[in-house]
């Protein structure tokens, strides 16, 4: 994908989700990716909230590299992805 200058972190994350939705099975996407959300973007790191520690581990092991590559392309810079468990109202628990 060509780099698009000016993507906000929120737009970049939404683009990454849309890209994953096309590449993953519907069941896997709905179970693991759809419930995630962008918690924070600082120091070139996307902090992504997950529902539980099992989901965090699943995403870390299977999608970190894919997401980093995609997000680096749309943000046009080096970025990292970190997954955290969030409670029902979206607070991250590290």
For each feature predicted by the language model, list its residue ranges.
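Intrinsically disordered, low-complexity basic tails and flexible linkers associated
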Residues: 1-91
